[in-house]
């Protein structure tokens, strides 16, 4: 139902994973996705769990700038400069932790364009999606890219103030055709 409410297309029951909070699922997603030496783009400033999960999985985190002078939005040109032949994906934390920035549709569309051009998987950490103020509205990046493979994360700890309850979910959206081995790995984990 969450995916329906957020307008996230192409998600079936077998595309949803539950876990002991989003933290567990982030680690699991990286362990199934990364090979030694693979690079993941991560926002700076970042939520430290992403760095740890990437390193634990044999990957290398590469920070892209979220510019304070631009309301903490990701610097798209900096993202493009950081992409190498080893880059496999991009982490998007929206709303961002720790900055609190809520990314506008235009920024999300630019990130989608970069991901398409470079065949990157987007890992969308959107656990703060219900904690937006002042009539702002969160847009799930997956709702803008029904064709693009995106790994989405959310849970109850922030929006329902039950951090100790440890209930999170991860859903896979978009075209999963080229990611069967990854999905099989997740199923084993």
Roles of regions detected by a PLM:
Residues 20-24, 28-31, 42-59:
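Substrate-binding/gating loop at the entrance of the active-site cleft, primarily
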Residues 1-39:
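Phosphate-binding glycine-rich loop
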Residues 57, 117-118, 148:
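Helix C-cap/helix->beta junction micro-motif
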Residues 62, 68-137:
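Active-site phosphate-binding strand-loop segment of PLP-dependent enzymes
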Residues 146-189:
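Conserved core segment of the aminotransferase class I/II
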